[in-house]
Amino acid sequence: MMSSLCGMPLTYLLTAAVLSLSLTDACFIRNCPKGGKRSLDTGMVTSRECMKCGPGGTGQCVGPSICCGQDFGCHVGTAEAAVCQQENDSSTPCLVKGEACGSRDAGNCVADGICCDSESCAVNDRCRDLDGNAQANRGDLIQLIHKLLKVRDYD
């Protein structure tokens, strides 16, 4: 009589338990995706590039009143950022370009040294333009080598 519980055979209960576990999307502390369990369904939601804004349309909308670009930094609450209000009219979320930064990686590096989320911007060392500094350092190094070659009459 131990093989049945409330009139159902134990094999049916075990089968139902295994089936329900295999059909659920669960994550545990170590294997949850960035953003938590609810972000598992983001593959089904399409995203698009955020609207262009700023001088010459070279920036991107980061929030409803924030427009940022590598060439000009960020405009917050200005006429250049006014076009970003239109992002609120879209039902499809937009994808802000830039490396993750800020508290819990909730923002994006949108300009040299600037990290923004949809509400605010802040200076962040993770967003420094390392490629630009590397180019300047290479130029300085080449000039130094050229001067050394002239001093040694190798030129």
UniProtKB/Swiss-Prot annotation:
One cellular component term from this protein's GO annotations in UniProt: secretory granule
Keyword Disulfide bond: yes
Protein modification: Seven disulfide bonds are present in neurophysin.
Modified residues (Glycine amide): 35
Positions of glycan attachment: 88
Keywords for this protein: Amidation, Cleavage on pair of basic residues, Disulfide bond, Glycoprotein, Hormone, Secreted, Signal
GO molecular-function terms, A-Z: neurohypophyseal hormone activity
Localization per Swiss-Prot or TrEMBL: Secreted
Cross-referenced Pfam families: Hormone_5
Family: Belongs to the vasopressin/oxytocin family.
Protein name, entry field: Conopressin/neurophysin
Annotated InterPro entries: Neurhyp_horm, Neurhyp_horm_dom_sf, Neurohypophysial_hormone_CS
Annotated signal sequence range: 1-26
SUPFAM superfamilies assigned to the protein according to its UniProt record, in alphabetical order: Neurophysin II (SSF49606)
Entry superkingdom: Eukaryota
Record's keyword annotation contains Coiled coil: no
Domain remark text: The cysteine framework is C-C.
Disulfide bonds: 27-32, 50-94, 53-67, 61-84, 68-74, 101-115, 109-127, 116-121
